[in-house]
Amino acid sequence: MNIPFAFWLVPVASVIALSMAFIFFRQMMSADEGTPRMREIAGHVRHGAMAYLRQQYKVVTYVFIALALIFALMAYVLKVQNPWVPFAFLTGGFFSGLAGFFGMKTATYASARTANAARKSLDGGLRIAFRSGAVMGLTVVGLGLLDIAGWFLVLSFVYQGENMALITITTTMLTFGMGASTQALFARVGGGIYTKAADVGADIVGKVEADIPEDDPRNPATIADNVGDNVGDVAGMGADLYESYCGSILSTAALGATAFALNGDMQMRAVIAPMLIAAVGVFLSIFGIYLVRTKEGATMKDLLRSLSIGTNISALFIAGATFAILYLLGIENWLGLSFSVVTGLVAGVIIGQATEYYTSHSYKPTQRISEAGLTGSATVIIKGVGTGMLSTCIPVVTIGVAIMLSYMFANGFDLTMSAESISHGLYGIGIAAVGMLSTLGITLATDAYGPIADNAGGNAEMSQLGEEVRHRTDALDALGNTTAATGKGFAIGSAALTALALLASYVEEIKIAMIRAIEDGREFIHPLTQQVFDPASATMPDFMEFFQVNLMNPKVLVGVFIGAMAAFLFCGMTMEAVGRAAQKMVEEVRRQFREIAGILEGKATPDYGSCVEISTRAAQHEMLVPSLLAIAIPIIVGIVLGVAGVLGLLVGGLAGGFTLAVFMANAGGAWDNAKKMVEEGNFGGKGSFAHKATIVGDTVGDPFKDTSGPSLNILIKLMSMVSIVMAGLTVAFA
């Protein structure tokens, strides 16, 4: 198998991304960490974060060993799976966990340095926080491309000269996405439960009952709250987007192998095209990172503009570069496919802007929630829920338009629904997802920046650095809240396109599983013609007809209902988990205020360790059931309802999960920034009736935006990945 010379750009981009991440890490570490008090607080947070991560990885390791043994049984005993799957699964989980580890290590070292830099200037604080966030962004894309390039080279050597080699290679590579998805779900759910248990506990007792400021060192839950920002928003988000990034590239490669199956040379070009777009995106992300800077006294809009310059210029350049890449590759309909990529990029920008509109206190929706605080917490909750529901409209319509346009651009606006037209159109949807995620190096940097700035503000408050420094860190923190909300919108949008591409890839995996079953002596009879069905020559419409995938089939309808229900079931379980953990935290903080004399007067030091322990134990205990449920549902549906039921499940999960995720993320973000707006002196300012009402809204919104909402991105992708990996089992036993 001849691998084109252009492919080598992928491992080169991977090495450069990891090298630049290391350079940014060294630059951050060379900055001064500040006063002894600042170092001490940063040390507490770092110790708590790393202790949690070690504990989480220990639990996840047991799950991975169990799943790898099941996959080995399926591959080597039952013979219903490719023998490389157990190994691919493990590497996907390993690299995802590694990205989270490096990101969190960087974030915990960066917070005190950001606060210290903010003592001198706003720009100094912004640069350290943003470049530290870039370590996470570049580590994710670097490790993702390294994993993809490594597996592609190994499998190309193993399967060279075989019939359907590229289809086998790409569908096998897809399975390492399940490893990444599983690790991501544990990171998101566990981290989300940890951070929100601490946050809710700190807010209810500290702000509402004891009337002390946020991040006050007298609050026993403060350190746990700061640790939680790292485990939830850095390690969790990194693992989530690592999975989307790899999933979009691999599913598009698999769809390309199918779309151009009759033209070997063109097939190879279609397979490496998404990898090359992602590789060029690395270079342009690095360029964009260097463009981010600001001036002293910058307003919120100035800060947003400085970040937007970096991300938007990177996106603009990757759009232009895509035309050149696909033209030089000589790929069929290169112009249409380039416009599909642009469609994905534009969709990402629109979803980001819509999220900013509904969650930033620079705009009316959040301002109205702040104003509702004047009449109490009930109206704040009602307004927030309404805002979250309204905010689903633009992202859903945007994704719908992006799906249609990318599909039609890629198949040359062929509306005949022929097999070739469908396969080319689906490839276009996949490559649109790659386009949306191609500048992940910088978009994830803006997201990881948020918790670093938040921790810097906490460090400044606990170290009592003075009003001017706190004002600067507050400005950076407010920007971080908006970038985090925008990043969540971006993550949800990319998850929807990736899940749709994975849905199409599932049919290809079923095809491979059926061919394997035929080689073992099994025969498939078409239910309508009663003739022997040959999957090797079958097209996408043929499979839909064979498995009777239509709305009149009750198996499909039942699958759709189960998929939609799964999203709500998952959210309910994670919300309840946060509620239970937060109750324990509230009781512990109240106990310390009651029993340790002198805490509120600042004469005694709270027991921070007990609160960290409560969050850690709760996260480990509560994350297992919802995470394992996400793995179990597709397997059970596959065996009971077959392929038609699984396709219904994935469609229902995608539609229900996407809409619910947007609602929860945006409602939570709006409540958070409504509280921030009041704290800036509006509607009575800190300590006022409106402030206490918006704190209640923010507390309700915390698990919305940081636990349940973001976890849904991974749920919809993980269900697709599990279905793909278990395709052989579904074909054999359904």
Task: Label each PLM-derived region with a short phrase.
Residues M1-A734:
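Hydrophobic packing and interface segments
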